[in-house]
């Protein structure tokens, strides 16, 4: 019987193992994320190219596949396409002058065509600065909003959370704060995460109309952009801020808002079949925000002396601050401004709930004169809120309690502020001095706004007040001449309301 002979060599296929270390194959596509085989040398957050033209970033590594997020929305990617890793991690392109730039996650200019080439780049993901390179927060970052600068002050290098329901004035506080930096030598970065394109355009137009784009950068992704782009956007904004801080600059960065950032990350991890945790968020939701916000610090003089002040925003539902993401970010930051919808609807703008809001380290950075004039304001407002409830029930109050109610009403009216009309440090000093020294007790609450406007108008017309404003950084307490000037201004206006 004849035996059949097989030539096994002709069935052998040579597998290039070295090639598989740097290359892979698209196995599955699912709503903006890719499951890929190969890529044995891949690292987390490494940039990749699909079919040599589509940009992606590695977001998931496990034994079965490599998970890639697509930066650009596209329907041109097919199963079987080649994937190759690049020689760098995901980064944002930078220009010599970042002022006035409106860019996306990778540093590409938005809303205008530009042939200008980037001069450098900065990685989106970096470690927190070492503890020995960080300095204390001792310099103020004035928002121009009386209730914040007096009761919950913010210092340069601080992380202060702004949280509240939808349409409670969070973005308006951020925009007012940016506009108030026009003469403060602070570079501002507004990071829009997954917002409507029309809303982003409206914010940009407001900044442009108030000449704030001259010292600002906008990093934006719209709701129509990919989930990966929305997830990466705050890190891109922080990378730009770090590049400016390394030049010794003071930077203010605003994240609008981190709730949408957490939602985008939740969607990505669920697509990668990662097990969900509380409220379906993944287990490392705390880490993605802490690793971002802890990069905002005040550096010591030996390491440039620059600072990053972060104002992250969180959207709450029905004023619930005990939800997963709000409690996470509250524990990461140095304080919070809690905005209440009912205050906003009653016309109390900015709608800051003083009883819940706190600034843990901002007091050390507050201007000493404002610190002295503000020391009992929180108590006055807290007592007013308690006694006001008794008045609502028709209970009679003694003379001392009625004085507390009167002071509370006056202070509440003083803290009301029109949008896009920030107050300078000396403006706030005049207002608080008038309140603390009893000059407003006979002014009806309905006329407080008019009194305040006329008071500032009279003050700005005096040469000695202008000189006081120019020198305020070097003045730590009011002299007799300053006190006399303030009382003359207040009494002149007071006679018109008596």
From Swiss-Prot:
The record lists ATP as bound by: 164-171
Coiled coil start-end: none
Say if the entry is tagged with keyword Transport: yes
> Record keywords: Membrane included?
yes
Q: Which Gene3D superfamilies match?
A: 2.40.30.20, ATP synthase alpha/beta chain, C-terminal domain, P-loop containing nucleotide triphosphate hydrolases
- Keyword entries, A-Z: ATP synthesis, ATP-binding, Cell membrane, CF(1), Hydrogen ion transport, Ion transport, Membrane, Nucleotide-binding, Translocase, Transport
Cellular component annotations (GO), alphabetically ordered:
plasma membrane; proton-transporting ATP synthase complex
Q: Which Pfam families match?
A: ATP-synt_ab, ATP-synt_ab_C
Q: Which reaction does it catalyse?
A: ATP + H2O + 4 H(+)(in) = ADP + phosphate + 5 H(+)(out)
Q: What is its EC number?
A: 7.1.2.2
List residue numbers at the site (Required for activity): 357
**Localization of this protein:** Cell membrane
Give the Gene Ontology MF terms in alphabetical order. Answer: ADP binding; ATP binding; proton-transporting ATP synthase activity, rotational mechanism
Membrane topology value: Peripheral membrane protein
User: What domain of life?
Assistant: Bacteria
- InterPro entries per UniProt: ATP_synth_asu-like_sf, ATP_synth_asu_C, ATP_synth_asu_C_sf, ATP_synth_F1_a_nt-bd_dom, ATP_synth_F1_asu, ATPase_a/bsu_AS, ATPase_F1/V1/A1_a/bsu_N_sf, ATPase_F1/V1/A1_a/bsu_nucl-bd
Q: Which family does it belong to?
A: Belongs to the ATPase alpha/beta chains family.
HAMAP family from the UniProt entry? ATP_synth_alpha_bact
Q: Tell me, what does this protein do in biology?
A: Produces ATP from ADP in the presence of a proton gradient across the membrane. The alpha chain is a regulatory subunit.
Subunit composition? F-type ATPases have 2 components, CF(1) - the catalytic core - and CF(0) - the membrane proton channel. CF(1) has five subunits: alpha(3), beta(3), gamma(1), delta(1), epsilon(1). CF(0) has three main subunits: a(1), b(2) and c(9-12). The alpha and beta chains form an alternating ring which encloses part of the gamma chain. CF(1) is attached to CF(0) by a central stalk formed by the gamma and epsilon chains, while a peripheral stalk is formed by the delta and b chains.
Instruction: Read off the PANTHER family from this record.
Output: ATP SYNTHASE SUBUNIT ALPHA, MITOCHONDRIAL
Q: What is this protein called?
A: ATP synthase subunit alpha 1
Q: Which organism is it from?
A: Listeria welshimeri serovar 6b (strain ATCC 35897 / DSM 20650 / CCUG 15529 / CIP 8149 / NCTC 11857 / SLCC 5334 / V8)
């Amino acid at each position: 019987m004849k035996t059949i002979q097989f030539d096994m060599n002709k069935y052998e296929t040579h597998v290039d193992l070295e090639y598989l270390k740097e290359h892979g194959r698209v196995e599955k596509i699912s709503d903006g994320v890719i499951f890929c085989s190969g890529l044995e040398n891949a690292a987390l957050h490494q940039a990749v190219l699909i079919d040599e033209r589509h940009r992606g970033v590695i977001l998931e590594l496990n034994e079965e596949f490599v998970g890639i997020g697509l930066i650009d929305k596209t329907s041109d990617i097919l199963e079987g396409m080649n994937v190759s890793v690049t020689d760098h991690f995901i980064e944002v392109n930078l220009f010599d002058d970042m002022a006035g730039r409106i860019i996306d996650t990778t540093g590409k200019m938005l809303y205008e065509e530009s042939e200008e080439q980037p001069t450098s780049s900065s990685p989106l993901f970096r470690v927190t600065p070492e503890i020995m390179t960080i300095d204390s927060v001792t310099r103020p970052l004035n928002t121009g909003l009386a209730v914040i600068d007096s009761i919950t002050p913010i210092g340069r290098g601080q992380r202060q959370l702004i949280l509240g329901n939808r349409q409670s004035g969070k973005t308006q506080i951020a925009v007012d704060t940016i506009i108030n930096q026009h003469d403060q030598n602070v570079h501002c970065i507004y990071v829009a995460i997954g917002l409507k394109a029309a809303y982003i355009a409206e914010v940009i137009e407001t900044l442009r109309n108030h000449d704030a784009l001259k010292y600002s950068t906008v990093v934006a992704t719209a709701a129509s952009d990919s989930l990966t782009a929305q997830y990466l956007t705050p890190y891109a904004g922080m990378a730009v801020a770090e590049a400016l801080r390394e030049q010794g600059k003071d930077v203010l960065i605003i994240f609008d808002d981190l709730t949408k950032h957490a939602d985008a990350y939740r969607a990505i991890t669920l697509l990668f079949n990662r097990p969900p945790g509380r409220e379906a968020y993944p287990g490392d939701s705390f880490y993605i925000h802490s690793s971002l916000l802890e990069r905002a610090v005040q550096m010591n003089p030996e390491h440039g002396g620059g600072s990053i002040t972060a104002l992250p925003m969180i959207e709450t539902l029905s004023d619930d601050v005990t939800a997963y993401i709000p409690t996470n970010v509250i524990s990461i930051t140095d304080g919070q401004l809690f905005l209440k919808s009912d205050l906003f609807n009653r016309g109390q703008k900015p709608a800051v709930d003083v009883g819940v809001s706190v600034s843990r380290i901002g007091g050390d950075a507050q201007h000493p004169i404002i610190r002295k004039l503000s020391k009992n304001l929180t108590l006055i407002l807290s007592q007013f809120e308690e006694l006001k409830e008794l008045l609502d029930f028709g209970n009679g109050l003694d003379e001392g309690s009625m004085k507390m109610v009167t002071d509370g009403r006056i202070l509440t009216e003083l803290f009301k502020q029109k949008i896009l009309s920030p107050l300078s440090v000396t403006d706030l000093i005049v207002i608080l001095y008038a309140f603390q020294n009893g000059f407003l007790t006979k002014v009806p609450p309905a006329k407080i706004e008019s009194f305040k406007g006329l008071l500032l108008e009279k003050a700005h017309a005096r040469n000695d007040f202008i000189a006081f404003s120019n020198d305020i950084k070097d003045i730590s307490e009011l002299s007799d001449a300053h006190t006399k000037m303030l009382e003359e201004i207040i009494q002149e206006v007071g006679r018109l309301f008596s």
